Amino acid sequence: MPAKRLFGIISIIFLFVTCISCKSSTDLSEEKRILVIQSYEKHFPAYEKMKEIMSSDLRKKGIHASVYSFYLDCEQYSEKQQRQKLFKKLNELSTWTPDIILVNDDQALNALISSRHPLAKSIPVVFMGVSYPNIPIIRKYPNMMGFYDKPDYKRNIELIRRL
C-alpha cells in the first residue's frame, strides 16, 4: 500500500475517532455503534490493516465500540444491486442504529448516497479513499465529511508517455 494512501487512511481514521469521541464526550464508557461500509469483498487486502488501525485508535481514546462491517462486493454486483443491497442492510440495522458511518471507496459512497436511505442524511458519515466524489451532491449532506484522492492527471499523462 503506497505511503500516501496509508497516511490518508490513518488520517481519516483519526478524524473518525475524533468525531465519535466529540459526538458524545460526556460518557466514553458507553458503547458506540460504528457501521463501516466497504466497497469490495470481505477479504480485500487493505481491510484487515484498516481494522487494526481503527481498533488501536479507538482503544487509545478509551472508546468502547461495536463495529459492524458491510461489504458491497462491488465487483460482483451492479450499481443498482449494490444500492438495493445497502438499502436492505440499513433497514435490517434499524434496531442497531449506528452512531456514525465510515464509508470506504467510491462505490460505497455512491451506493450510500444513491440509496437515499434516511440514515444517510441523519447520522454522521465519514468517507475516505474516494477518487471521484460528486461534490455538489455531497454538499447536500451536511452530516458528511471526509477526504478524496484527487487524481494527478498531469503526472499520469507523463507516466503514460514514458511507457
Name every feature range the model reports, one short phrase each.
Residues 2-10, 22-163:
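Short hydrophobic alpha-helices and adjacent helix-cap/hinge residues
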Residues 13-21:
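Hydrophobic h-region of N-terminal signal peptides that target proteins for export
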